[in-house]
Amino acid sequence: MKDKSIKVLEFNKIQEILKNYTCTKAAKDIIEDLKPYDSMYEVREHLEETKEAFKLLITKGAPPFEGVYDIRSGISLAEKGSALLPGQLLKIAAVLRCARRFKEYINHKEEEESYRVLENICEGIFSLPKIEEEIFNAIEGEDEIADRASSTLYNIRRSLKEKNYSVRDKINSLVRSYSSYLQENIYTVRGDRYVLPVKAEHKGAVPGLVHDQSSTGATLFIEPMSLVNLNNEIKELMLKEKAEIERILTVLSAKINANITGVKTDANIVWELDFIFAKAKFASEYNCTCPTINDEGIVDIIEGRHPLIDRREVVPISVKLGEEFTSLMITGPNTGGKTVTLKTVGLIHLMAMSGLMIPARENSVISYFNNVFADIGDEQSIEQSLSTFSSHMKNIVEIMDKADENSLVLFDELGAGTDPTEGAALAISILENLRKRGTKIIATTHYSELKAYALRKEGVENASVEFDVETLRPTYRLLIGIPGKSNAFEISKRLGLPDYIIDFARENISNENIRFEELIENLQEKSIKAEEDARLAENLKLERDKEKKKYEEKLEGLQKVRDNALIDARREAKNIIKEAKEEADKILKDIRQLERMGYSSDARRKLEEERKKLKDKLDSIEEKEIKTVHEGEALKNVKEGDEVLLASINQKVIVLSKPDNKGDVLVQAGIMKITANIKDLRAAKGSNSNNSSSKIKKSKKLNLNLRRVESSVDLRGMDAEEAIYTVDKYLDEAYLGGLGEVTIVHGKGTGVLRKTIMDMLKGHSHVKKYRLGEYGEGGTGVTVVELK
């Protein structure tokens, strides 16, 4: 692929936008080197990885890239056997953790989901949890080694703490004793040694060693002789602490060195995934789709948009090439939007061949070309003393030398910059030569000769960019099959040129040319009308489908509400009666106790009667429910995916798990998952639960309306009540959205909000487990929640 064409089509600007979606410098470097791939297989594989990442973003939210760093310098030092700094080790551990969690993120999927390319990439992850754990256990911050890093360090620091207590007690006593000689009644530290701020004129009153003096010389910092031994002991312990820390860092660095292959592999995979998900985030932001790729030269871009033009202003274009025709001549006036069309086609091809999804509608088709050549814009070079024509011709000579049947060539204003007759003849000759080679061509021109060439030559098609003569602005809509007209007379008239000049100009044009231009104008009007009708029909169809979907969803929602209300009402009724029965049993027990003590049994008889009424009522409810159940005995065996009848609520449910040793199974009733006993299950009408041919896929109800659920929620600034409501609602959305792990940001502060949230999480139905954030995740300011 020619670097010049890549530059002319502004692919470098796409690279710069992509970099904004990465987390690491390493991923940015990958993007910096990104170019179209060398084979169609590579293009398809890299497009597939982008598509899979895009799907994961929609269904699972943001991937676990928290705390990902560029650790290339740390790896390089470890590879040489050098001891790493605490911060370098922490960053390596954070990347290893990210690799491990990403593998879990990919593997945590439903049965019907498949992420072939990403799963293959993640298969290469070594996962080094032991090293990761040792580093996080030993190091608490960029410059902080934990006491638990080793028993030796723990003992040294404990002794150091005791010595510091002793010396502080001693020096506080000395402060009181020498208070009249001190600048202030305090002590301070100089060079890790406790000293007193003694007035210079009283230095002889405090026997000891002078360590420093103030900038004015009025104060001397003296270490009292009685503290020298204690300070020496503290200094020795500090040296031992430093040596032990260096030993710990050396040991941890050696473990990185011993596993350097795994560390490098995991880091490289994380950076590659960072790059892949940057492509997916770009696709999400720019409403991109994954095109179909072929190597037959067939192009069908449906409503493609130039990604560098403001999305509020860009007009989609649809371009076909390679089936009915292999050359497309876009004609019309200058500033008519022809160049934008060329650049859109060229840039979309470069994006697709670089593994990027494209800003176009679904079902767009892109051909893999070995080369994309672009001669666009004024490449005039003052230094080389080349005219516009010479500059273009220099590019064209190079294109003619290298273009073949696997090339796409984009010409802007072919033949311009010289005598129109000669320029048009030369342009036709160039186009015809390339056409015979099988090269796919899109060229812009305002020469009438090229319109005629396209009309009479098989395999060449005319096209034009619609121009609004009222506003004197192009609409940028591409009309294939219709040559463009110059609109010179209309534009001149709108700009105020006198009619008599325009009329005289018309008289100097042949009748054939006038009729040709009128024919073109008529064709344009009909084409525009046909396109508007087609667009209106499409919009009506989309509106109808949207309304249909809305009412179907509303109906489904009402059905779920009804089912849930019925389940809740029945359960509540049974619970009320059951609780009343249990209360009656308790009172009866108390009355029996009173009878044994000699009290009257009248109350007991009355309560027995009430208890019997309650029992009869409960039995009656259960009997009514049983009558509504499909006749048949309780099932003895069920398996995952069976559709059965849950007798207690008289509703069809899906079996989600095998019976445990108590006979309990997990079933799904509507959107609810509940536990039932196998004795309460019956065969559903129209299904054979023991030999079901219709397997229901075990899955959460994913939020497939493409509404993205974020992987974190921020509670900072909320009071406890608002925070609890927000978290409860968020966890429901995250659970239904299929997220495996989420982060709750509550801040550090006083810890009240953190405790409130943790108390709430203890009994939440969607929560499997939770923990405080680790290094790189936000520490104690966040809580990481794993969902069921």
From Swiss-Prot:
Keyword entries, A-Z: ATP-binding, DNA-binding, Endonuclease, Hydrolase, Nuclease, Nucleotide-binding, RNA-binding, rRNA-binding
Taxonomic superkingdom: Bacteria
Top EC group: hydrolase
Residues the record lists as binding ATP: 332-339
EC number: 3.1.-.-, 3.6.4.-
Family annotation (InterPro entries): DNA_mismatch_repair_MutS_C, DNA_mismatch_repair_MutS_core, DNA_mismatch_repair_MutS_sf, MSSS, MutS, MutS2, P-loop_NTPase, Smr_dom
GO BP annotations, alphabetical order: mismatch repair; negative regulation of DNA recombination; rescue of stalled ribosome
Quaternary structure and partners: Homodimer. Binds to stalled ribosomes, contacting rRNA.
Function: Endonuclease that is involved in the suppression of homologous recombination and thus may have a key role in the control of bacterial genetic diversity.
NCBIfam families in the cross-refs: mutS2
Family: Belongs to the DNA mismatch repair MutS family. MutS2 subfamily.
UniProt protein name: Endonuclease MutS2
Organism, as annotated: Clostridium botulinum (strain Kyoto / Type A2)
Gene coding for it: mutS2
